[in-house]
Amino acid sequence: MAVQQNKKSPSKRGMHRSHDFLNAAPLAVEPSTGEVHLRHHISPNGYYRGKKVVKTKND
């Protein structure tokens, strides 16, 4: 097993962990309907980039 040679200081420990956080998923607004959805996903009404791509129950 690997064993550290010297103790890592709190500053170095913090620098090591500086990228271990989560980001909120970016949201997009559908231009034709104004709905909010995840980027690169279709909106709840079946629109993607202003075009109807999936039939929904309401259609």
From Swiss-Prot:
The keyword Nucleotide-binding does not apply. Belongs to the bacterial ribosomal protein bL32 family. It holds the Pfam family Ribosomal_L32p. It comes from the Bacteria. GO terms for molecular function: structural constituent of ribosome. One of its GO terms (biological process) is translation. This is Large ribosomal subunit protein bL32. The keyword Ribonucleoprotein applies. It comes from Paraburkholderia phymatum (strain DSM 17167 / CIP 108236 / LMG 21445 / STM815) (Burkholderia phymatum). Residues 1-25 are annotated as: Disordered. The lineage of its organism: Bacteria, Pseudomonadati, Pseudomonadota, Betaproteobacteria, Burkholderiales.
